[in-house]
Structure formats: C-alpha cells, structure tokens
C-alpha cells in the first residue's frame, strides 16, 4: 500500500513499502524464530553499527524513545549519584525533567536553544562539583536541528572520570559515530528514526561493564534496564514483558535495507544531500533557517515563519498536505518557526518536489 503523503518529520517518518509489509505476519514471542532469529540478530547488528570495538552490548525496551531514556537515567545512576545534563532544546530539558521526577540531583547547563554548549562551562561544573557522576547530552537536538559537539563534550567528561550518556535518538543510523572511540557508555535511540523502522520500542547500546553496574539500581520495574538486558541475555532474545512483535520484525527489515543502501555512511550522504537541497530551495523562496549553517544537522531544519500578517502555519500545513507533504510545527520558545525533516524514505528528488509544492502553498503572496 502506497502512502498518501510523505512525512518530512523527525520520526515517526516515511518508511519503505517493504518495511510496512514486514508487519503482515503474526509472531509468537516464545519461538526461536522470533527471539533467536530476529531479536538476537537485531541486538548484534545494532552493536556493530555503533562501534567496531568489543565490550558493548544492546538491550531493546518497549515504548517510545523517551521510555528508553528514562530507563537509562533511572537505572544507570546510583542513589548517591548526580547528573549533569546539557539543555539546549526540548529533549535535553526532558532528560532534566526525568531526573527531577526520579529525584536524581541534576546540574543543568543551559546555553540557549540556538547555541551549542560552552565546554568551559561544562569543565567548570565538573571540576567544582565532585558529586557529579554522570553526564548526558542530546546528539541531534530536533527542537532546532542543532548538532551538538559530542566528541569534545565526551572528552571533557572522560577527563573527569564521568559516565557518559548520549541521547542519539534522532541521529543513530544517520550520522556515523563510533561510541567506543568517543567514550560513550550508554547510547539511546529508537526504532522509528534513522534506521527507518516504525514506532514501538527504543534501544540502548551500552558498555557492558557499565550496564552490569545497573543491577538493583532501577527506580521502575518496567524500565529496569539491567533486568531487561539480563533477561534477553539469558533467554536468547526473550523480553520480560510483551514485546511489540510487528514493530520488531519491521525494524529487522529496516536494518537489512540500511545494509543494502550501503550502511550509515551512505544514508548520511543521502540525508545530507536532502538537507542541502532543502536549504538552497527554501532560500530561493525567501525562507531563512533558524540556525547558522555550521550548526545544521542532516536530520531536520528549522525555518523562520513568514512575517506576513496573513500567514498561519495551519493553513500552510494543510496546503502542503494536500500536495502530499507533511511538515512539522516549530518548537523553539523564542522564535516563530516551522521544521522540515530530511530523514526516512526520502530522496533529493522528493525534496525538489517539496520546494515546488511550498511555492504553490505560499498563499500569503498571492495578489
């Protein structure tokens, strides 16, 4: 079945027809053909995508990507631990909110939504507060499309002996990284992002020695990261509680299609071409990106809304959807913006068609 429109969003996103077709079969969660032949293969493939080094493992968690973030924050940090988190958008702020809900002491570094973190501020905080045990940062902050400097951030954190948590929700699978080389201890992502699967579960790729330290520390039963991992390890892919079987099978297919495309490097190149084509086309129509070009990610781009008094996002959105494209509203607190994603089953030719559709949808310029 063909889609009626293209989702130009940061996830859920447009998937291939073959990924959707993979969900047409039912699976028994007790069978080896599901646990060993699908779940365990997924776990192995994820680790290989994340690093070429040994010592890492992966665990899948039911729910949204945020559930996997909460599972990590709530399991990795001991009762006497403290978190430092970079908040330069809604998703960094969400990590701080999770820590607050779980009564985990948290130091927040807030450079603002359109700025990268100042590493000297992070350095000062870590040097002056030995109680901080863990640090967390979002790789691609989809509030704006900002790509944060994770290599430099992790280097500072490791120089102070901290455990590093990376929210790579909207970047893993679309931007090449080696988490072992960067010194990342826990990396979190989701099925419905750059791997191009569908919603239903997230996953954590972790240094096994750090994951094993999580035993007995979880602040939630269903979000116990260690217990979920241990169950999968001992029972060859078995989940503790009901697994989203159709989503898992679709994700397996999506991983195969990532390999067929040429891996993360090839997908990154496609996303980057999409983004550059988008920005050039939007500028030709008079739109300007929120961020400076050097801060852009290939994942999603924020654009300033037109200042014309007749412009309304909902009307603009509706006109685009009628032409087969769905975009995202803005999420920045101090600027009127909208966002356009470049990921999913989307190609440069689609972006070129989008630019034509946007030109037709600019009703406020009609005389």
From Swiss-Prot:
Q: Name one GO biological process term.
A: organic phosphonate catabolic process
Going by the UniProt record, its keywords in alphabetical order are: Aminotransferase, Pyridoxal phosphate, Pyruvate, Transferase
Q: Does the keyword Transferase apply?
A: yes
EC number(s) reported in the record: 2.6.1.37
- Which sequence positions carry the modification called N6-(pyridoxal phosphate)lysine? 193
Looking up InterPro entries in the UniProt record yields:
Aminotrans_V_dom, NH2EtPonate_pyrv_transaminase, PyrdxlP-dep_Trfase, PyrdxlP-dep_Trfase_major, PyrdxlP-dep_Trfase_small, SP_NH2Trfase/AEP_transaminase
Enzymatic reactions = (2-aminoethyl)phosphonate + pyruvate = phosphonoacetaldehyde + L-alanine
* The UniProt record lists the keyword Transferase: yes
Q: Which cofactor does it need?
A: pyridoxal 5'-phosphate
User: Which GO MF term does the entry hold, naming one?
Assistant: 2-aminoethylphosphonate-pyruvate transaminase activity
According to the record, the signal peptide region is: none
EC class: transferase
Recorded hits in NCBIfam families, A to Z, give: PhnW-AepZ, PRK13479.1, transamin_PhnW
Q: What family is it from?
A: Belongs to the class-V pyridoxal-phosphate-dependent aminotransferase family. PhnW subfamily.
- What exactly does this protein do? Involved in phosphonate degradation.
- Subunit field text: Homodimer.
Q: What is this protein called?
A: 2-aminoethylphosphonate--pyruvate transaminase
| Taxonomic lineage | Bacteria, Pseudomonadati, Pseudomonadota, Gammaproteobacteria, Vibrionales
